[in-house]
């Protein structure tokens, strides 16, 4: 992911056509302030999530493995955020050298893909647990979860390779600044366009469709369960949680993805207007703040859907140490729903809807 489109994907545009795109005094004040807030809140929140899941919950469930990795991925990104805050406050002047430029840039890209992939796997895990509970013990194992996380980290690293290779520190003559930006040997390189479209498709569109499909099927399964168990009161909170999960992901990322796509159109020469380029480059860091602030809250958001997570989180805040006895799972807000569609079939079918949150 890119923290400032005006100094990287749009580098050719800055040098030639629109040198002042995205360069406003209020941006140089507001964005570093927002980055600082995200850094403090994110480091504090995600560190507590890691402590609660690993030391209090004892990392006993598939969902907890995904949440732990989600928090760790966020922490890796957050550690580089002060660099970007200083970079923006200095009006996009990079004082930290080439190695930190590559490392910090790769961390941003890595976090985008790792977080989105982990959230997608978490939705698939919920789908298997609720829609196919009989197959769940076979498919949802701790080993499978850990292997999946390793694969996700490798894929995120692979997706970040272009950033490591092409992101460098160099001097822009007409603006007289040293930037940390994508630098291509040829100004006609199609790589920035490819990276932008990859971010749109692989970093948002496909994962969102999977998440939407998973929770839609979960919704239908739970609704059918409630219809069969008419004697039990319906808990609408479950459906509100499902809606919140899907909408939270969508509205966190769609603004940034829209402006990333507009930036691709500018790269392709479809959009020529410098006013539009200025709007895109000005809005880009703002949409990034929205995406990454929500992204860093994801572990807390998903974790707090479980009752035991909330219990242990409060214990940690009160300096109550974890008990020696391990806890088998994150408790759920949703009670188990069991029903038999027919008493006259070849075999009784039993389904259990486990938690939408974390199990």
Swiss-Prot record:
Lipidation (S-palmitoyl cysteine): 355
Biased composition (Polar residues): 335-352
Principal subcellular localisation of the protein: membrane
Compartment(s): Cell membrane
Transmembrane stretches, start-end: 26-55, 62-89, 99-125, 142-165, 191-216, 240-268, 279-304
Bridged cysteine pairs (disulfide): 18-274, 101-180
Pfam families the UniProt entry points to: 7tm_1
Expression (tissue specificity): Adrenal, liver, aorta, kidney, lung, testis and heart.
Single GO MF descriptor: angiotensin type I receptor activity
InterPro entries cross-referenced by the UniProt entry: ATII_AT1_rcpt (IPR000190), ATII_rcpt (IPR000248), CCR1-9-like (IPR050119), GPCR_Rhodpsn (IPR000276), GPCR_Rhodpsn_7TM (IPR017452)
Membrane protein topology class: Multi-pass membrane protein
Chain positions recorded as angiotensin II binding sites: 15, 17, 167, 182-184, 199
One of the GO biological process terms: inflammatory response
Sugar-bearing residue positions: 4, 176, 188
The record's account of how the chain is modified after translation: C-terminal Ser or Thr residues may be phosphorylated.
Protein name as it appears in the record: Type-1 angiotensin II receptor
């Amino acid at each position: 992911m890119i923290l400032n489109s005006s100094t990287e994907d749009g580098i050719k545009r800055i040098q030639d056509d629109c040198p002042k795109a995205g360069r406003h005094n209020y941006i140089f004040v507001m964005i570093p302030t927002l980055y600082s807030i995200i850094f403090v809140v994110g480091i504090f929140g995600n560190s507590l999530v890691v402590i609660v899941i690993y030391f209090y919950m004892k990392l006993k469930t598939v969902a907890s493995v995904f949440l732990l990795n989600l928090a760790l991925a966020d922490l890796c990104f957050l550690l580089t955020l002060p660099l970007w805050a200083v970079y923006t406050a200095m009006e996009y002047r990079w004082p930290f050298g080439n190695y930190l430029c590559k490392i910090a840039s790769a961390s941003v890209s890595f976090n985008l893909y790792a977080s989105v992939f982990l959230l997608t796997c978490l939705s698939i895990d919920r789908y298997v647990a609720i829609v196919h509970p009989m197959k769940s013990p076979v498919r949802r194992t701790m080993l499978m979860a850990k292997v999946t996380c390793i694969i996700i980290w490798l894929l995120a690293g692979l997706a970040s390779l272009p950033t490591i290779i092409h992101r460098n520190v160099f001097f822009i003559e007409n603006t007289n600044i040293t930037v940390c930006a994508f630098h291509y040997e040829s100004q006609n390189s199609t790589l920035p366009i490819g990276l932008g479209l990859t971010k749109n498709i692989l970093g948002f569109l496909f994962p969102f469709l999977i998440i939407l499909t998973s929770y839609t099927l979960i919704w239908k399964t739970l609704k059918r369960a409630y219809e069969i168990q008419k004697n039990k009161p319906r808990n609408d909170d479950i459906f509100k949680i499902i809606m919140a999960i899907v909408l939270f992901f969508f509205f966190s990322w769609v603004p940034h993805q829209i402006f990333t796509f507009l930036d691709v159109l500018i790269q392709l020469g479809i959009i020529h207007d410098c006013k539009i380029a200025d709007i895109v480059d000005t809005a880009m860091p703002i949409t990034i703040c929205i995406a990454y602030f929500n992204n860093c809250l994801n572990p807390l958001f998903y974790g707090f859907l479980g009752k035991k997570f909330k219990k242990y989180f409060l214990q940690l805040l009160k300096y109550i140490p974890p008990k020696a006895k391990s806890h088998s799972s994150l408790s759920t807000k949703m009670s188990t729903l069991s029903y038999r569609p027919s008493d006259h079939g070849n075999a009784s079918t039993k389904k259990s809807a486990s938690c939408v949150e974390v199990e």
